[in-house]
Amino acid sequence: MSLKIKSKITIGVLLIIFLLSIIFTLENVSLAQTSPQISVYKVVGSADLSNPGSAGYWSQIPWTNISLTANIPMAPTSGLTHYLLVKAAWNGSWIFILEEWQAPEPAFNAWSTAVAGIYPNASGPGLFRMIELTPGTTYSLERNYTNYVSIINGKEETGRIVFNYSGITLPAPNNTEITVMSNGTILLWHSPRPVEDLLYNDGMFYGYYVNSTWYYPDRAAIMWYLGSGVPTKDDMNIGGKYPGQQFDGITFKDAGGSLAQSGGSANIWMWVSGATWNNSTYDPAFKSNIWQNESLTGLSYVDSGNHGFAVPLYTNNTNMYEVDTAGIWYTPVASEGLNGSLFFIWTGAKYENGSWVVEFARPLSVPLDYQPFMPNITVGKTYYVAFAVWQGRLGETLFDKSITSSFLSLELVTTPPTSTTTSTSPVTTISSAIPPVTLYVTIIGVVVALVALVILYVVFRR
C-alpha cells in the first residue's frame, strides 16, 4: 500500500473521529442547555379554588403562552382555541396549575353526555352527540336490506342508509337516524364511536352539530406522560370502543382514546364545565347534586366538601380508562379499591372577561393504589405534559379539540418566583414544536457533517 493511500485513509479516519466527537459534544450541549418549558415555582401558601388565580403568589409568576392546534385539521370546528396561558406552582406538598383561555361563548348548563347517562332526569343540551356531515355528502336508502331500519327526518323506514361523498360510499349501521336540513346538510344522531372513525377516514366528518339550544360542555385537560424517555406523540387514536372491536362487519384495530405513543401510558386530568365545575347555577351535575349520591355514581364514596374536581383518566396503547371503580366516562381501571380517586384532583373555575380561568390542585404524592395510573411529582425530575381545550358551544367535543402539537417539559424548581414581576406578569410564548436550543444544535451538526463530507470527497478524489 502506497504512502499516499495510507495518508488518505489516515485523514479519513481522523475526520470521521472528529465528526463523531463534534456530534456527541453538540448533543451534550443540547441536553445541558435545555430548560423546562414550564417551571413550577416554589411558593408559600395554598390554593383558593373559590376564586382561582387569586392567591398572592400567582401575581409573581409569569404566564407561559402555549400554542394550540387543531386535533382534526380538516374540521372547521377543530382548533378553535389558538393559545392557552399557563402558570404553575408548588408549596411542598401540593402542585397548582392555573390556566386561562379565551372563550367567546361559554357552554353554561350543558351536560356531560356520560354524566347525563347516569341521571334519569337529565334534560337540555349535551345529552348526546350529533354529527354534521361534510357539505356535499348525500345519502340513499337501500331498500333491499329488509332487516335494516333507518330513521329519516323522524320517520322510520325499512332499508339501509348509504352515505356518498365524492364517490366514496359508506353504509350506515342498523337503526341509524339522520335529519336532512333544508339546505341539504345531513345530521347524524347518537353517533357510536366506530361510526365517527369511519366518517373521519372517509372525509365525511365535518364537525359536531350545535345551535343556540344544542351544544356541549367546555373542557380542559392536562396529560402527564408516564412512560420512559421523551415522548414524541401526544395524540390519541380514533377507533372503536376497544381494540379489535367488530362493528357492522368492520374490525377496528385501535380503541378510541388509546395513546398513540408506542409503549407509553399517560394520566389525564379532565375538567368539564357540565360535570366537575362545582357551580350549582351553570353546572347541571352539581345542580342535581350527583356527586353526593352513591346510588347514582356507583361509587362507595362522595365528593368530600362538594368541591370541584378533574376526572382522572388513564390511557395506554390498549384503551382509555377512568381511575375509579365506577367508570362513568370510561371503563374503570380497577374493580375495587381506589377509594376517593375520582375526586382526588381538585379544581376551581370561573368565567370572566370573556375567558375561562381554571385552577388544578393535587397532592404531589399519590396513594399506593393510584400509583400505576397517576404520577408522583417530585423535585429533580422532568415531566412531559400536554394540554387540550374544548369550546363546546362552538362544536368541540370528544376527539374534536384544540391541542398542543407535542409534549412540553415541566419541572419543579426550588427557587421562588421573581419579586420583580407584578400582577401584569410578562408572557413567555412557547410552541410545542422543537425547542430552539435543540433546533440550533441540529443545524450546526448538519453543517459540520456537510463540511466533513466535502473534505472527505476532496481527499479521496486526489
From Swiss-Prot:
GO terms for molecular function: heme binding; metal ion binding. GO terms for cellular component: plasma membrane. Residues 27-431 are extracellular. Disulfide bonds: none annotated. One of its GO terms (biological process) is electron transport chain. Residues 1-8, 457-462 are cytoplasmic. Glycans are attached at residues 28, 65, 91, 121, 144, 164, 174, 183, 211, 278-279, 293, 316, 339, 353, 376. Binds 1 heme group per subunit. It is a multi-pass membrane protein. N-glycosylated on at least seven Asn residues by identical hexasaccharide units composed of Man, GlcNAc, Glc and 6-deoxy-6-sulfoglucose residues in the molar ration of 2:2:1:1. O-glycosylated on probably as many as 35 positions by single Man residues. It is found in: Cell membrane. Monoheme cytochrome whose physiological function is not yet clear. This is Cytochrome b558/566 subunit A. It comes from Sulfolobus acidocaldarius (strain ATCC 33909 / DSM 639 / JCM 8929 / NBRC 15157 / NCIMB 11770). The lineage of its organism: Archaea, Thermoproteota, Thermoprotei, Sulfolobales, Sulfolobaceae.
